Amino acid sequence: MGAYKYIEELWKKKQSDVMRFLQRVRCWEYRQLPGIVRITHPTRPDKARRLGYKAKQGYVVYRVRVRRGGRKRPVPKGIVYGKPKNQGITQLKFQRSLRSVAEERAGRKLGGLRVLNSYWINQDSTYKYYEVVLVDQAHTVIRNDPRINWICNAVHKHRELRGLTSAGKKYRGLRGRGHLYHKARPSKRATWKRNNTLSLRRYR
């Protein structure tokens, strides 16, 4: 087995004594640092490489901290409108994953880079920590590499804000494949609308 296979097996056993100790120490370190911080190399090199990372010029990795739990509805001065049924503030569940939120925050802060992918690295009772792989689309090495230069096209600007990354496609319900799965297209919202709209055509 190669080295990456051993690393993968280590991360599969997160409850082992070694990993529990390591994760606790790392989590303490992460808490002392800013919410978005650049790191020199990925914490999980096997995972990063599976998601497209290469240890070469133009690729950067940032660690992002996201607060766990539900999303409170922002209501200025507590003023809510409509019927009591729709006036909830605290018990609401955000439809997007925390991983997609981490990608969004990294993408907003680093506007000149393109978000490629992300993965989980740690969590405690308050926060989840993700590492986001970003690509410098202006770098010559990236522009000359046929495997990654697709991301240099202008259509991929802020793909994380439009649900085009892997995490984005997952919360949009577009991850699956195969027979009958095309019924979920073009989106969950469009599918719901199509199935719940009564259409009485003139000639039927």
UniProtKB/Swiss-Prot annotation:
Species of origin: Picea mariana
Which cellular component appears as one GO term in the record? cytosolic large ribosomal subunit
Keywords for the protein's UniProt record, in alphabetical order: Ribonucleoprotein, Ribosomal protein
> What family is this protein classified in?
Belongs to the eukaryotic ribosomal protein eL15 family.
Q: Which Pfam families match?
A: Ribosomal_L15e (PF00827)
Which GO molecular function terms does the record list?
RNA binding; structural constituent of ribosome
Which terms under GO biological process does the entry name?
A: cytoplasmic translation
Where along the sequence do coiled-coil regions lie?
none
Q: Which gene encodes it?
A: SB62
InterPro entries (UniProt xref) = Rbsml_eL15_core_dom_sf, Ribosomal_eL15, Ribosomal_eL15_CS, Ribosomal_uL23/eL15/eS24_sf
Protein name listed in UniProt: Large ribosomal subunit protein eL15y
Give the lineage.
Eukaryota, Viridiplantae, Streptophyta, Embryophyta, Tracheophyta
